[in-house]
């Protein structure tokens, strides 16, 4: 038998080969971003850039840019089968050059698209991609990354500061918008977070997006940190700097939908490429955006690899997945006749469910200690359950039910709170059904919802006193914590992405005092295992009195695994002083007052009171022992025992 000579060309490591096509076509090419997009390489001794783009229904594709005077006839790309991945090597292209793909559609049109896998983008309003090299970023956070692998998020303190970079703080008088760069922000936010006591920062709007008013939720560059604040190297510097100061970094991540901007993903090759073809699935009616087609392996792979990209390449510690409910339900935001049932006749998006299970299994399986956080607003079961047990596999879920009941209760005149007492206790009926984060996010301080301070009833100082007791109740309630920027010092105005926070308010005593209060709550939280170790275990929480309806007072205890340094919270939600409020306790041991809202540094009266309380053998609240405490109106007392 005569063997035929092989004519197969050897594939270089940077080139798209058969295995890449196979894995991408199966939806399992977890590092596809290392092949797709634009990468500086050396070919036959020449330095240049290798381009690769997926455009399955394109007739022809060429790459255009500053390196070829945007001439679509110069650098034609070769189609690779079976998936329709177009590639070419351009020796004239170099780091820093702008580029796009010119795609000839089956309709005979030419459309100009940014690179879906670009690692850097032109500053808006420009829409081109920019060649860069992120293969050798400077990292010195190995201590943090090693410790992260041993993290059990359920049993660790997680207090998140939700931040929109462009409006947290700005430089006055700059010719541009005054944005802090990634490097400037790293130093400023680190100093503030360490002083306040947060454990993590969650950043909105990091992935490239053209419209500031979308807050970063209409993404066109999924693999590119926005150029508003600097380069990819600058972004990596920021993450590294935060890690070296023991601060975790969480990013908002948007796999639910994408905008219709002409340079973006919509109708990428002249046909619905990344989105569902039928508008009853592919169009989001509320947001005017396109919905990703999770049924296509290449699309789910694009998103899954993107999650891994941020976590593995940029060392990000968690992703807050936006609008999960809109992905799970086919009829989300749609009227009858506007949606297509699944094959079983139901309203569940089976492909999105499979995507989440795959996503969370892979991200968390490859990266121990990383958090996948679901913003999910319905009662979908097992969001944080294991995929092996038919759960979605998220680490944590935003507790939207708690947030709604809590804010509605706090808006009420104290006289009427007794009629809504259950709104503050109901959350404990389901507190252990998921692994929850208690959130007071950006969504609660926009669109005429008012700032947290202005949600509070009353006038002047009463609003601040209400906010103090609200924050204390939140910090004591089981669940991780998240607060949006500005609310920690009682911002008056609603948030706007167009301006920085009203830091000038800190010149006024009431705003300093509420900031002091939240800071001390954060430090209390971080140093007491009782407040986080058993968040997901009923053994970590007990009501002392949840039925003091007519006085609107709540008392409860928090416990740690070892049973040491337990905490007792007593919270008064009316302005009525209770000079001898008797609280039942489970043990006859000393109770040490560790936090008292009536101190002058928090805006209280400064009235002296004992620091240690010895219970008497007097039944109260169903307990054998009790002690009396002078509880002021809107007062909070936290005791250690």
Residue ranges and their predicted role:
Residues 1-157, 182-193, 197, 461-464, ...:
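Carbohydrate-interacting/catalytic domains
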Residues 55-57, 81, 92, 164-169, ...:
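Short, flexible loop/turn elements at secondary-structure junctions
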Residues 125, 315-317, 335-498, 505, ...:
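Conserved alpha/beta catalytic core and glycan-binding cleft of carbohydrate-active enzymes
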Residues 145-155, 164-348:
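Substrate-binding/active-site clefts of carbohydrate-active enzymes
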């Amino acid at each position: 038998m005569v063997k035929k000579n092989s004519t197969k060309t050897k594939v270089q490591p940077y080139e798209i080969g058969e295995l890449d096509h196979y894995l991408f076509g199966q939806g399992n090419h977890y590092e596809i971003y290392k092949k797709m997009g634009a990468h500086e390489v050396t070919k036959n001794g020449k330095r240049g850039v290798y381009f690769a783009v997926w455009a399955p229904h394109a007739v022809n594709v060429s790459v255009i840019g500053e390196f070829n005077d945007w001439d679509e006839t110069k650098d034609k790309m070769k189609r690779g089968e079976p998936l329709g991945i177009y590639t070419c090597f351009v020796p004239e292209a170099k780091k820093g050059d702008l580029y796009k793909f010119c795609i000839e559609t089956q309709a005979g049109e030419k459309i100009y698209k940014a690179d879906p896998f670009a690692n850097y983008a032109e500053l808006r309003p420009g829409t081109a991609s920019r060649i860069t090299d992120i293969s050798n970023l400077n990292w010195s956070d190995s201590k943090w990354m090693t410790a992260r692998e041993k993290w059990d998020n359920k049993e660790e303190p997680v207090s998140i500061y939700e931040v929109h970079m462009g409006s947290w703080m700005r430089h006055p008088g700059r010719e541009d918008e005054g944005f802090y760069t990634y490097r400037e922000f790293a130093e400023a936010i680190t100093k503030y977070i360490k002083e306040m006591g947060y454990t993590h920062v969650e950043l909105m709007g990091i992935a490239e997006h053209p419209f500031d008013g979308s807050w970063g939720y209409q993404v066109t560059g999924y693999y590119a940190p926005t150029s508003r604040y600097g380069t990819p190297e600058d972004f990596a510097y920021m993450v590294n700097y935060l890690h070296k100061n023991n601060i975790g970094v969480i990013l908002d991540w948007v796999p639910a939908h994408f905008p219709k901007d002409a340079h973006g993903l919509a109708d990428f090759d002249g046909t619905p490429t990344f989105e569902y073809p039928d508008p009853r699935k592919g169009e989001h009616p509320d947001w005017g955006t396109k919905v990703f087609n999770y049924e296509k392996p290449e699309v789910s792979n694009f998103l899954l690899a993107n999650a891994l990209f941020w976590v593995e390449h940029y060392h990000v510690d968690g992703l807050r997945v936006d609008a999960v409910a809109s992905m799970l339900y086919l009829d989300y935001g749609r009227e009858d006749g506007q949606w297509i049932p699944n094959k079983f006749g139901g309203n569940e998006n089976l492909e999105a469910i499979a995507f989440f299970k795959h996503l969370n299994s892979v991200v968390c399986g490859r990266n121990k200690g990383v958090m996948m956080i679901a913003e999910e607003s319905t009662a979908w079961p097992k969001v944080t359950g294991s995929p092996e047990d038919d759960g979605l596999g998220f680490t944590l879920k935003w507790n939207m039910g708690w947030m709604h009941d809590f804010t509605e209760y706090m808006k009420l005149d104290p006289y009427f709170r007794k009629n809504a007492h259950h709104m503050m206790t109901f959350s404990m009926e389901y507190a252990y059904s998921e692994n929850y984060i208690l959130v007071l996010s950006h969504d609660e301080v926009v669109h005429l919802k008012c700032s947290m301070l202005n949600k509070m009833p009353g006038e002047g100082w009463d609003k601040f006193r209400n906010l103090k007791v609200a924050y204390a109740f939140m910090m004591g309630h089981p669940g991780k914590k998240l607060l949006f920027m500005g609310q920690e010092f009682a911002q008056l105005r609603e948030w706007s992405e167009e301006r920085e926070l009203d830091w000038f308010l800190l010149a006024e005593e009431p705003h300093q005092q509420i900031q002091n209060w939240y800071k001390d709550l954060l430090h209390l939280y971080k140093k007491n295992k009782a407040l986080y170790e058993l968040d997901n275990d009923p053994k970590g929480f007990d009501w002392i009195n949840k039925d003091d309806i007519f006085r609107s007072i709540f008392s409860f205890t928090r416990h740690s695994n070892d049973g040491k340094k337990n905490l007792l919270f007593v919270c008064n939600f009316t302005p009525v002083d209770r000079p001898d409020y008797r609280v039942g306790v489970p043990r006859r041991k000393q109770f040490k007052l560790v936090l008292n809202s009536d101190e002058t540094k928090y805006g209280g009266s400064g009235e002296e009171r004992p620091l240690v309380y010895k219970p008497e053998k007097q039944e109260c609240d169903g307990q054998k022992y009790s002690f009396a405490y002078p509880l002021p109106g809107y007062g909070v007392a936290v005791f250690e025992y």
